[in-house]
Curated annotation (Swiss-Prot):
The beta-hairpin motif is involved in DNA binding. This is UvrABC system protein B. It holds the Pfam family Helicase_C. GO terms for biological process: nucleotide-excision repair; SOS response. InterPro entries: Helicase/UvrB_N, Helicase_ATP-bd, Helicase_C-like, P-loop_NTPase, UVR_dom, UVR_dom_sf, UvrB, UvrB_inter. ATP binds at G44, A45, T46, G47, T48, G49, K50, T51. It comes from Streptococcus pneumoniae (strain P1031). One of its GO terms (molecular function) is excinuclease ABC activity.
Length: 662
């Protein structure tokens, strides 16, 4: 694999010390990893500090670590937490860089070809480059990723071999450096200086790496020798310091040298002729014409520019892989001895297993109708067994591990004690007869104590009817349906915490960000109807929503007790018993979590104020609108910096609305 340039140690920074059963969980996990155990499960109850335990393990075993989460929001939260725990190490973020992505597709029934359309988020693209370059430069790296990490990325060997290495005293002509930069897909632009570009002024070449957003490098020549290299502010040109070595990584992950490109183009040409013969034999003349025209254009672009839109579809030829061979992914950028941690594994594993099939069926349609060569099928996510072949050592992290994880290992390490001393809630089963009036009484009791209630139903109609009824009864209630976007969902949770309303009704309250310490009652309607949300895991996760309040209580409304209900009740009672014994032994009084009510993230507070005032932008004069745009621009940038891209997009839309009036 690739040799690392620096060999640093992980250094964990935290004002907390491991407490509860964190110390034994950390010790067991570390001992097992150092003992060579391949797979283990950290079964941590909600609110027991699993991320802190993961951080302790990483710092002690000192291996490059890949943490996989099941969506961007969760990955962003974990990235922020790990950044705080490891300020001196490389904590990187690797998720899909598309703000918007419409994959290339063909619908035969209506003869509709949908061209690939996407909007790439520049900030995330920078972070992806930062992740891959960090993995090749050092070993103290944590990459927090979504399942994007199992998608094709280009050869790490080609990527590493293409690095342009510069140091003062190196004999290289200015023109040779410019050619080398163009070869690794850097673009010359003397006016608009951005990531992945360089500019030239006499004997000075300024390079803006793809993994940076503020700092560039100034390479000064004396004849055909590098005189010195300085780090500079990209915007102002202010010198920040001198560097004695500079590694410039390619501006794209799909990079191929000239020799390999010639071979790849020849293979693409040969495959094209083969496929054209197949189409002609089958009488598919339209498909043959379409494929010939598209592929020949791409070949011309590859020859002239070394790149074409959709270059990833030719990655099999460019990487020199055989048919059916797995693509290179982020996992190949790690050294052999690395650690994988899968957060919320009961959700994430399902995603890893399902990615391949969906991608395959869409691409087969494109191949069959002459939009792509058959080799495009090998630009794909990894299959489950291919992902498993990359696993050296893995920790599955979940409150409710799935069947897959339990099949992989019998080593289950429990983390049940919460640092706050909070107990799992008491669970009781009540009959469905008169359940709504019974529930109304329970809600009123909570409202008097300024506490909140979650109600989970099985159908949309039931949720809507219940919400309408409670509104008539004078209860401040909201219904959270599946169409609500992440940002709106976060705002609803904030309003619930602030007491804008007291009751939240929903079908699936298991999504991320639904942990509300103010919730002391969780009511589960139709608890005896078996299914995804009423199986043992679903019930345990739902019960966990009341585990952040010292008054936490769960009522299941059901006429029979199913096996799933019984197992969930028994497991909750088992955990509660262990927690109570620990609290008694150590004299701990459970305290409700005191969690600051942030307005999504701090930067949105100003926006919220604007919204609260309900400013009529039509009534603002030109100068006031200009000032509002400036404010919004600043807030948008701040949102991007803390990786809240959905908020940034919302602010951007507000800006466009204001600008449209001028």
């Amino acid at each position: 694999m690739i040799n690392h340039i620096t060999d640093n140690q992980f250094k964990l920074v935290s004002k907390y010390q491991p407490s509860g059963d964190q110390p034994q969980a950390i010790e067991q996990l570390v001992d097992n990893i150092e003992g060579g155990e391949k797979a283990q499960i950290l079964m941590g109850a909600t609110g027991t500090g699993k991320t802190y335990t993961m951080s302790q393990v990483i710092s002690k075993v000192n291996k490059p670590t890949l943490v996989i989460a099941h969506n961007k929001t969760l990955a962003g939260q974990l990235y922020g937490e790990f950044k705080e725990f490891f300020p001196e190490n490389a904590v990187e973020y690797f998720v899909s860089y598309y703000d918007y992505y419409q994959p290339e597709a063909y619908v035969p029934s209506s003869d509709t070809y949908i061209e690939k359309d996407s909007s790439v988020n520049d900030e995330i693209d920078k972070l992806r480059h930062s992740a891959t370059s960090a993995l090749l430069e050092r070993n103290d790296v944590i990459v927090v990723a979504s399942v994007s990490c199992i998608y094709g990325l280009g050869s790490p060997k080609e990527y590493a071999d293409s690095v342009v290495s510069l140091r003062p005293g190196l004999e290289i002509s200015r023109d040779k450096l410019l050619n080398d930069l163009v070869d690794i897909q850097f673009e010359r632009n003397d006016i608009d200086f951005q990531r992945g570009r360089f500019r030239v002024r006499g004997d000075v070449v300024e390079i803006f790496p793809a993994s940076r957003d503020e700092h560039a490098f100034r390479v000064e020549f004396f004849g055909d020798e590098i005189d010195r290299i300085r780090e500079v502010e990209a915007l102002t040109g202010q010198v920040l310091g001198e560097v004695d070595h500079l590694a410039i990584f390619p501006a794209t992950h799909f990079v191929t040298n000239d020799d390999h490109m010639e071979v790849a183009v020849a293979k693409i040409q040969a495959e094209l002729e083969e496929q054209l013969a197949v189409f002609e034999k089958e009488g598919k003349l339209l498909e043959a014409q379409r494929l010939k025209q598209r592929t020949e254009y791409d070949i011309e672009m590859l020859r002239e520019m070394g790149y074409t839109n959709g270059v990833e579809n030719y990655s099999r030829h460019m990487d020199g892989r055989s048919e059916g061979e797995p693509p290179y992914t982020l996992l190949d950028f790690f050294p052999d001895d690395f650690l994988i941690m899968i957060d919320e594994s009961h959700m994430t594993i399902g995603q890893i297993k399902g990615m391949y099939n969906g991608d395959r069926s869409r691409k087969e349609m494109l191949v069959n109708y002459g939009f792509r060569l058959p080799s495009a099928l090998d630009n794909r996510p990894l299959r489950r067994e291919e992902f498993e072949s990359h696993v050296h050592q893995i920790v599955y992290v979940s409150a409710t591990p799935g069947d897959y994880e339990n099949e992989q290992t019998e080593t289950v390490i429990e983390q049940i004690i919460r640092p706050t001393g909070l107990l799992d809630p008491e669970v009781e089963v009540r009959p469905t007869m008169g359940q709504i009036d019974d529930l109304l009484g329970e809600i009123n009791a909570r409202v008097e104590k300024n506490e909140r209630t979650f109600i989970t139903t099985l159908t949309k109609k039931m949720a809507e009817d219940l919400t309408d009824y409670f509104k008539e009864m004078g209860i401040k209630v909201k219904y959270m349906h599946s169409d609500i976007k992440t940002l709106e969902r976060t705002e609803i949770i904030r309003d619930l915490r602030l007491g804008v309303f007291d009751v939240l009704v929903g079908i699936n309250l298991l999504r991320e960000g639904i942990d509300v310490p103010e919730v002391s009652l969780v009511a589960i309607l139709d608890a005896d109807k078996e299914g995804f949300l009423r199986n043992e895991r679903g019930l345990i996760q739902t019960i966990g929503r009341a585990a952040r309040n010292s008054e936490g209580h769960v009522i299941m409304y059901a006429d029979t007790v199913t096996q799933s209900m019984q197992r969930a009740i028994d497991e909750t009672a088992r955990r509660r018993k262990i927690q109570m014994a620990y609290n008694e032994e150590h004299g701990i009084v459970p305290q409700t979590i005191k969690k600051e009510i942030r307005d999504l993230i701090a930067v949105t507070k100003a926006v919220a104020k604007e919204e609260d005032k309900e400013v009529d932008i039509n009534s603002l004069n030109k100068q006031e609108r200009k000032e509002l745009v400036k404010k919004l621009e600043k807030q948008m940038q701040e949102a991007v910096e803390v990786l809240d891209f959905e908020l940034a997009a919302q602010i951007r839309d507000m800006m466009l609305e204001v600008k449209a009036l001028d």
